[in-house]
């Protein structure tokens, strides 16, 4: 929070084409190592900083490398949200197998830092030039969205979007609770590793085919709100659940940390509507 002003100036100022700035932010959803429990999603949005949310230790390096590439391409600072459980864990990573795996795109020369732009020009450049370039990148990024169970037209009834780390628990729950891990079921499951700006094009199949979409994210709703906005604009006739079900009944807490138990309880408490798993 205390760094917000400096980060806002850096992001609206822009970065150099051979520079790049990645901001690693440590989130402590339970206050394990902090005086307060908190989330950084709304801060990134307020600053206009796109960000990745690695699910585990192994994803930090590839997403970090892509974050630098995206920063150079778009002129934006790019965030890397790392929650305390990921920061406190360890993993063996084979560095020899790490290869850059991100879009190869020619940058717009107008996105990069210039000298002495007035405040209004810096703000408009961020929103009219840089962030649209980020959206173009997201549409082609393999790290931004990972599909575990694909959408099947005419069959998929429930689409699940897991945001960041919680996708690990969702995948475990599906393997445990559903036959064949849900592969032959009516469920589609996507892990979202870039909560903002939302890679809308990568989610279009799910949002147009599924009868109901369930967004599972920790803390206050953030991705769910973005998807609701898309559905209103596109006039999508589907049910949307997340912190509450379509009838307004509570499903997931807006505080603390989600667990495998939370996900399994969702399976035993289905939507009161006609969506079947």
Question: Which sequence ranges carry the predicted segments?
Answer:
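Thiamine diphosphate
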Residues: 1-72, 83
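Short acidic, glycine/serine/threonine-rich loops at helix termini
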Residues: 2-6, 31-38, 63-66, 72, ...
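Short coil/turn connectors at secondary-structure junctions
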Residues: 15-21, 46-49, 73-77, 154-158, ...
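Short beta-strand segments
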Residues: 22-26, 79-85, 161, 216-217
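Conformationally flexible catalytic loops at phosphate/diphosphate-handling active centers
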Residues: 74-151
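Terminal amphipathic helices with adjacent charged low-complexity linkers/tails
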Residues: 81-116, 204-266
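Glycine-rich, anion-gripping cofactor-binding loops and their flanking helix/strand elements
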Residues: 146-162, 167-233
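Conserved small/polar residues in nucleotide/adenosyl-binding loops
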Residues: 267-274
């Amino acid at each position: 929070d205390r760094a917000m002003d400096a980060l806002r100036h850096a992001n609206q100022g822009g970065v150099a084409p051979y520079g790049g700035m990645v901001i690693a932010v440590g989130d402590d959803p339970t206050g394990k190592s902090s005086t307060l429990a908190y989330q950084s999603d709304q801060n990134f949005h307020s600053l206009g900083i796109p960000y990745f949310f690695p699910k585990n230790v192994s994803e930090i390096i590839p997403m970090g490398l892509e974050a630098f590439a995206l920063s150079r391409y778009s002129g934006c600072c790019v965030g890397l949200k790392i929650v305390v459980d990921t920061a406190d864990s360890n993993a063996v990573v084979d560095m020899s197998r790490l290869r850059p795996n991100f879009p190869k795109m020619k940058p717009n020369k107008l996105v990069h830092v210039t000298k002495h732009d007035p405040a209004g020009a810096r703000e408009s450049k961020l929103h009219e030039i840089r962030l649209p370039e980020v959206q173009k990148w997201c549409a082609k990024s393999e790290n931004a969205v990972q599909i575990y169970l694909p959408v099947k037209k005419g069959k998929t009834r429930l689409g699940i979007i897991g945001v960041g780390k919680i996708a690990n628990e969702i995948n475990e729950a599906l393997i445990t609770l559903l036959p064949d891990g849900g592969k032959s079921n009516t469920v589609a499951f996507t892990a979202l590793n870039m909560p903002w700006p939302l890679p809308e094009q990568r989610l279009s199949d799910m949002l147009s085919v599924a009868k109901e979409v369930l967004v599972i994210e920790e803390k206050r709703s953030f991705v769910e709100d973005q998807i609701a906005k898309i559905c209103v604009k596109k006039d999508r006739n589907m049910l949307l659940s997340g912190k509450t079900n379509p009838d307004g009944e509570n499903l997931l807490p807006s505080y603390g940390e989600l667990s495998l138990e939370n996900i399994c309880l969702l399976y035993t408490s289905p939507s009161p509507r006609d969506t079947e798993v």
